[in-house]
Amino acid sequence: MNIEDLVWKHALANAVRYGGKADVKAVMAKLMADAPELRQRAREVKQLVEEVVAKVNAMSPEEQLRILRERWPDALEEKKAEQKRPGIEGLPELPGVKDGVVVRFAPNPDFVLHLGSARPAILNYAYRLKYGGRFILRFEDTDPRTKKPLVTEEVNAYNAIREDLRWLGIRWDEEYIQSQRMEVYYDHARRLLEMGAAYVDLCKADEWRRLRNQGKACPHRDQPSEAQLELWDKMLEGRFGEGEAVVRIKTDLAHPDPSVRDWVAFRIIDTTKTPHPLTGDKYIVWPTYNFAVSIDDHLMGVTHVLRAQEHSVNTVKQSYVFKHFGWEQPVTIHFGRLKIEGATLSKSKLKSMKIRYDDLTLPTLAGLRNRGILPEAIWDLILSVGIKPSDSTVALANLYALNRKHVEPIANRYMFVADPVKLVFEADRELVAKVPYHPSFRERGERVYRLGPGRVELYVQRRDAAAGKVIRLMELANVEVQKIEGDVAYGRLHSLTLEEAKKAGAPIVQWVWDPVEVTVIKPIALGKKAEERGLGERHLEKVEVGAYVQFFRYGYLKKKGPLEFVYLHD
């Protein structure tokens, strides 16, 4: 299939899946995943994608579907193809699966996604692929005070999360935003108050805490439903201020965990002071996490919940809402924390740093993407950890090793010399070097260098140019370094073949002729980068921005700008 047909296929498939509007970034991500060799031509391909997406989005949904069915019916069977993703079939079976699963990924948009939050997203989606069913994206944004959704000129967390998920190859079947569902929560709160399963508490916080710790009911708990509904209406009307009234779910006042005892379902937040970025000051009575989650999991038909062990108490709290309504609670699987050695996954710490959320030194998905980590490597890491209940600690080196596996086939090889010295020697004949772009993919071609006869000048690393040492100039010749004067090394042509180099114990070194200045950016810590400058071969000018390369004896890199590269790993 030619490139244009491939772009049309993915643009139409993306539009059909998402209500008639294709997304350029999503189509690019799918293209690069399916045809990694196109990464070397990213700029050219993106221009084509933009043109095709504009044409696709101008069509009616019916026309989009018709063309897709006629030309690429296989795209409508995406689920079957996705199920072939390596590692999915090896996941442990989930209990209680009937006709597929309904799972959800429910981020709080108070920050962007990081490596840790990729775990529930990938695991839930992986099980949706394994069994079939539905994957729900639900933004849990009902705390505009302490976990205010992040919407600024620099970043809109809602959109950033969507972009991160698309980059991971995750495609949701339904999307909900809890702050847009307030009337649903109000309706269910009223029903619970009418049933006598909830009540409006007017106690002071310290008085409630004392009663709770003693396992005693507050004086408002057993008031008739009529009185409760009257207080509820006053809450909605703004007759109470922050902290003056809350709605509590009736649980077990003797429960061994005091936090479970009659937990708060609704509280008052003065949105004239802390407006919600989507709803402003329209609402002042806000559902807590546990209440909104309970209602939504039932109404959305969630069958299985996969989430971190830290939510185990929340599962207990939510069970009371399900019992009061007579609903079946989803099967819940708790997995341990994922700790990454060498990376900070704390939202609060990452948010406090005065650097962009997509800075390539951060373990945010946007930061990892900018650095050059591929989504396939993150999938491999998360699936290797799985859903075990114990905490898991992995080193960033593990992620780099997995990334190397995916980058190696697509990274063409180039020569780069850090800390260069000029090497000068005389050649009694023409020396020819044929350097393939990739040793395993000879069809990508090679560049040919012809040097000599006569004086030859090229550049090698200072550490390779020790006096009295024979070195093998990769694919070119063997030279004995005779002396070094400042930044110039002088040598003599020793021999020509690799076999002769081996006999002389000569190391193979990279070299550069007719060089260009190259800058390498090296992430060294959160918010900290180092720059290394050196000389590279002129062919690096033709490498597309965003393409992956390997510098011989140096490591893998991603091109960031004109002759500027980001170091990934060795």
From Swiss-Prot:
EC number of this enzyme: 6.1.1.17
UniProt entry keywords in alphabetical sequence: Aminoacyl-tRNA synthetase, ATP-binding, Cytoplasm, Ligase, Nucleotide-binding, Protein biosynthesis
InterPro entries assigned: Gln/Glu-tRNA_Ligase (IPR050132), Glu-tRNA-synth_arc/euk (IPR004526), Glu/Gln-tRNA-synth (IPR000924), Glu/Gln-tRNA-synth_Ib_cat-dom (IPR020058), Glu/Gln-tRNA-synth_Ib_codon-bd (IPR020059), Rbsml_bL25/Gln-tRNA_synth_N (IPR020056), Ribosomal_bL25/Gln-tRNA_synth (IPR011035), Rossmann-like_a/b/a_fold (IPR014729)
Chief localisation class: cytoplasm
GO molecular function ontology, one term from the record: glutamate-tRNA ligase activity
Keyword ATP-binding appears in the UniProt entry: yes
Reaction equations catalysed: tRNA(Glu) + L-glutamate + ATP = L-glutamyl-tRNA(Glu) + AMP + diphosphate
A single cellular component GO annotation: cytosol
Positions of short motif 'HIGH' region: 107-117
Keyword Ligase among UniProt keywords: yes
Gene3D superfamilies found in the cross-reference section: 2.40.240.100, HUPs, leucyl-tRNA synthetase, Ribosomal Protein L25, Chain P
UniProt-listed Pfam families: tRNA-synt_1c, tRNA-synt_1c_C
An example Gene Ontology biological process: amide biosynthetic process
Location within or outside the cell: Cytoplasm
Entry similarity comment: Belongs to the class-I aminoacyl-tRNA synthetase family. Glutamate--tRNA ligase type 2 subfamily.
Protein's job: Catalyzes the attachment of glutamate to tRNA(Glu) in a two-step reaction: glutamate is first activated by ATP to form Glu-AMP and then transferred to the acceptor end of tRNA(Glu).
This protein's name: Glutamate--tRNA ligase
Organism of provenance: Pyrobaculum arsenaticum (strain DSM 13514 / JCM 11321 / PZ6)
